[in-house]
Each structure stands twice: as C-alpha cells, then as structure tokens.
C-alpha cells in the first residue's frame, strides 16, 4: 500500500483487498484503546475492531459512509 507520510494515511486505491463492502456506520462502542464499529452493508452488518485513536483521526461517527476491507485475518475501515 502507498503510505503518504505527510498525511499519515494510506489511500483507498493503494489497498489491495478482494472483499470490500461499502456501508454506513450504525454503531460505535468506544473503549479506552480499542473501539468496535458496526457497518451496515448491502450484505449485512460487518463489525470491525480498530483503535480508538483511528476512530478519532478518521472522524468516524454514526452515519459516516465507509468501506469495510475484509481480509482473512482482519476487517479494516476507511472513511469515504
């Protein structure tokens, strides 16, 4: 993936993942270190656990449009 140190983020185009699900955040359970994100997609709910820091940096909130990237070992979130 392409990492831009000026933005401290990866571009969506640079991420090579087969299973991508566009959806809307329906619930955020925020913890001190990790947060659980429920994303409503056309295929159903996808749940991801990401750092609370990432939730804040991406400015994620209920209703945010995101893409859930599903790999065999993880589910990642990118804000649209």
Feature roles, as predicted:
Residues 1-80:
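Non-catalytic connector elements of ABC transporters
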